[in-house]
Amino acid sequence: MASPSANLLVLVGSNFACVKIASRANFASSPDFKTLIEQLRHKGYGHFIVDLSECVLMDSTFLGVLAQFGLKLNAPNGAGQPGIELSNPNTRVTELLENLGALHLFKTLSGELVLPADVTRCTPESIHPTHEQITRTSLEAHQTLMAVNPDNVARFKDVTQFLAEDLQNLQKCKQP
C-alpha cells in the first residue's frame, strides 16, 4: 500500500484554518487529513479553506473524506458562510467532484488565495495509519459517496463490500 501521498501544510488564523494539499490526495493520506481536520475542529476552528492549487490528483477515498466534512461543515447553520471551501482545484479534481456528485457540497474559489498576515504556519505530523485505519477510512469514505449520490452505489458497491470484509478480517486477527 505504499503510494506517494499528499503533503499537508496548515496555516491557522484567528477564526479559520487553511490546509494546503500538495501532490497526490489519496487513500494513504486520508487518515492524516481526517485526523487533522477533526483536531482543528476540536480546537474550535469552524471555517476551513482547502488549498488544492498543488494537488495533482485526488482519489475517491480522499474525496469521500472531504465529502464527510462538506456534509458536516456546510450544513445550514444560519451563519451564511460555508464551513469548508475548496481553493483552486484543477480540472481533473473538479471533474471528479462533479462526476461523483460531491461538487455541490463545497464553495469553490479560484485565483490567488490571499490570507491575512496574522496566520501561523504549522506542519502536522502523520499519525502513521495502520492498515486497519486506512481500510476503515476508505470504507467510510466510499459509504459517504454512496449516500451523497445514489449513482455511486453501483460504482462502489463491490469496493465497499471488499473493504468491509477486509476490515472484519483485520479485526479478527487482532482478537486474542
Question: What positions do the PLM features span?
Answer:
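Long, charge-dense
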Residues: 93, 107-124
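STAS-typified acidic loop motif
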Residues: 4-35
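Short acidic DE-rich linear segments
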Residues: 172-176
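Short amphipathic alpha-helical segments, especially helix-boundary/capping motifs
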Residues: 10-14, 44-47, 70, 118
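Amphipathic alpha-helical interaction surfaces in cytosolic regulatory modules
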Residues: 27-106
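Charged/polar low-complexity intrinsically disordered segments, enriched in acidic residues
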Residues: 116-170
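Short hydrophobic/aromatic-rich motifs at helix boundaries and adjacent loops
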Residues: 7-10, 40-42, 65, 115
